[in-house]
Regions:
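Sequence context surrounding c-type heme c attachment/ligation sites in exported
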Residues: 3-6, 24, 31-154
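Hydrophobic membrane-insertion alpha-helices, especially the h-region
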Residues: 8-24
């Protein structure tokens, strides 16, 4: 009887622990922002890393647009591949845990979109269609920037 009680307590603690981890995985480390958006609270170095990644996405988008404008498919491929899923592969798990699920989902879907743009360009998809794909990806950037801000918690 005593071992059943201990087993029940252990199981309960396990379930509570999993629930807490799931809550933080979904919610991330957030607080009310200063401008109506939700602030994601990060350490300064983590914030810098996320902003650097965002600038990389913006630079890749510019490269796609320049390539499209010049009819340079190789440039479109190079620019979009630079921002694909491979560029997000080495993100620190501790940082990922601090990011809300929606933020992570939007970010990862933009990286996936960049890979899809590269595949489309490699497959000979016409430039107007590439531009539509790029516009769809940028819509996600706008949605994310409309909902979230990065804070160092100070």
């Amino acid at each position: 009887m005593k071992s059943n009680k201990i087993a029940s307590i252990a199981l309960l603690l396990w379930v509570v622990t999993i629930a807490v981890f799931a809550w933080f995985f979904i919610r991330g480390n957030t607080t009310a922002g200063t401008d109506g958006r939700t602030a994601v609270v990060l350490q300064p170095a983590e914030r810098d890393l996320v902003l650097t990644e965002m600038r990389g996405l913006l630079s890749s988008t510019q490269g796609i647009l320049e390539g499209a404008n010049q009819g340079d498919v190789a440039r479109i491929i190079l620019a979009s591949r630079a921002a694909g899923m491979a560029s997000a592969a080495d993100v620190n798990p501790a940082l990922m845990a601090k990011l809300p699920l929606e933020f992570k989902s939007l970010g990862m879907s933009v990286h996936h979109d960049m890979d899809e743009i590269a595949k489309a360009a490699e497959g000979g998809t016409p430039v107007p269609e590439i531009l539509k794909m790029t516009s769809k990806a940028i819509t996600k950037c706008v949605a994310c920037h409309s909902a979230w801000q990065l804070s160092t918690g100070s």
